[in-house]
Amino acid sequence: MATPQSVFVFAICILMITELILASKNYYDILGVPKSASERQIKKAFHKLAMKYHPDKNKSPDAEAKFREIAEAYETLSDANRRKEYDIIGHSAFTNGKGQRSNGSPFEQSFNFNFDDLFKDFNLFGQNQNTRSKKHFENHFQTRQDGSSRQRHHFQEFSFGGGLFDDMFEDMEKMFSFSGFDSTNRRTVQTENRFHGSSKHCRTVTQRRGNMVTTYTDCSGQ
């Protein structure tokens, strides 16, 4: 029969082992960012890792476990209050006495993560590719235009020197095939707009050469 002293020693050992396991599971290391990382850096790292390890895209046996870990880290570090608690207290801020997450996280109970929601800020995916691409490029690349001042060539230039969208272009080209992208270094995406009440037919053309993206509106008609 175990004595109270042996039970106490056993409990201490379990606690120490749990702390060691949690200490080795550093959320910043999981996402590959420094502790001083900005919200944008954390989000960028999460997007990149989620694209790589999401079970719908990665069929390796450990992909789901890795994705859970990534999502758990992002769940904490993307929230300012939770991140502050984590930085001060560590994992114990979100665990019960048994070393389990105590906040009712969906990642603890079941695996239910919407891959489409992951890229809602970069809306280039989905069944209706043309509609989503149009929305994306109009939101991010096209300046508001007054109806009376539309011109045949309205140019906008953007530098993607290592920025977030540049990385997204590279990642998406590796994983997906777009009809709007050709095999050379020139990338062209076209979206079309029909203006009601007139016979004018306009399209938004976005071209990428190297690190420069040029967008213009091409209008034709009576």
From Swiss-Prot:
One of its GO terms (cellular component) is endoplasmic reticulum lumen. Disulfide bonds: none annotated. Residues 26-90 form the J domain. SMART domains: DnaJ. Keywords: Chaperone, Endoplasmic reticulum, Phosphoprotein, Signal, Unfolded protein response. Coiled coil: none annotated. The keyword Transcription does not apply. Residues 91-222 are annotated as: Divergent targeting domain. One of its GO terms (biological process) is ERAD pathway. It is found in: Endoplasmic reticulum lumen. Gene3D superfamilies: DnaJ domain (1.10.287.110). GO terms for molecular function: Hsp70 protein binding; misfolded protein binding; protein-folding chaperone binding. Residues 1-23 form the signal peptide. The modification Phosphoserine is found at S133. It comes from the Eukaryota. CDD domains: DnaJ. InterPro entries: DnaJ_domain, DnaJ_domain_CS, Hsp70_co-chaperone_J-domain, J_dom_sf. Interacts with HSPA5/BiP; interaction is direct. Interacts with ERN1/IRE1 (via the luminal region). Interacts with DERL1. The J domain stimulates the ATPase activity of HSPA5/BiP, while the divergent targeting domain is required for efficient substrate recognition by HSPA5/BiP. The divergent targeting domain specifically recognizes and binds to aggregation-prone sequences. PANTHER family: DNAJ HOMOLOG SUBFAMILY B MEMBER 9. Co-chaperone for Hsp70 protein HSPA5/BiP that acts as a key repressor of the ERN1/IRE1-mediated unfolded protein response (UPR). J domain-containing co-chaperones stimulate the ATPase activity of Hsp70 proteins and are required for efficient substrate recognition by Hsp70 proteins. In the unstressed endoplasmic reticulum, interacts with the luminal region of ERN1/IRE1 and selectively recruits HSPA5/BiP: HSPA5/BiP disrupts the dimerization of the active ERN1/IRE1 luminal region, thereby inactivating ERN1/IRE1. This is DnaJ homolog subfamily B member 9. It comes from Rattus norvegicus.
